[in-house]
Amino acid sequence: MTDTATRLAFARAAQAQRRLHRRPPASPRARPGARDGGSPTQRRGQAYESAALRWLARQGLRPLARNLRCRAGEIDLAMRDGEVLVLVEVRVRAHAGYGGAAASIGASKQGRLARAAALLLPVLLRRHWPGAPPPVRFDVVAFEAGRPHWLRGAFWLAEHAPAQGRRGQDAQGWRVR
């Protein structure tokens, strides 16, 4: 085989491999709940996010955005509490077993939220904060048995934590109070 023929054979083989591994486009029928606003679980989550948004607004926070998505994950709610940007994770558990809704946000989930926030922060700041970037606080609204529990300041983004009250950082860069 000549050099050109070998390259052509490899190119055809690579093309055939790509064809084999190509996924068919998802049709609306292939995605569960695509036409009716999502699966029952998604609709339930959206209802609790709406309830959390209304509840936090009654507590004095101002809504900025909801369901912010990027490749690193999703931020359920973005709100403003005075001069603090508050990113809210909404969790729901029917029963308090295994620690309940708030306990389901471990170190790995906090890391995903922080990575998503790092990617989404420039857009949020451009839209809602002219000037110096504000402190960024993560709150959790945990619904257990239908009742909201607000964990204010569950964790902070290390580079956007307020100066007062700092006691240091843990191994992942979270502010420890």
UniProtKB/Swiss-Prot annotation:
- Pfam families in the record, alphabetically? UPF0102
- Coiled-coil region(s) at which residues? none
Query: SUPFAM superfamilies annotated for this entry?
Result: Restriction endonuclease-like
Q: Region Disordered: what ranges?
A: 13-44
GO molecular function list:
nucleic acid binding
Q: Which family does it belong to?
A: Belongs to the UPF0102 family.
Q: HAMAP family in the record, alphabetically?
A: UPF0102
What name does UniProt use for this protein?
A: UPF0102 protein BB4515
**Organism encoding this protein:** Bordetella bronchiseptica (strain ATCC BAA-588 / NCTC 13252 / RB50) (Alcaligenes bronchisepticus)
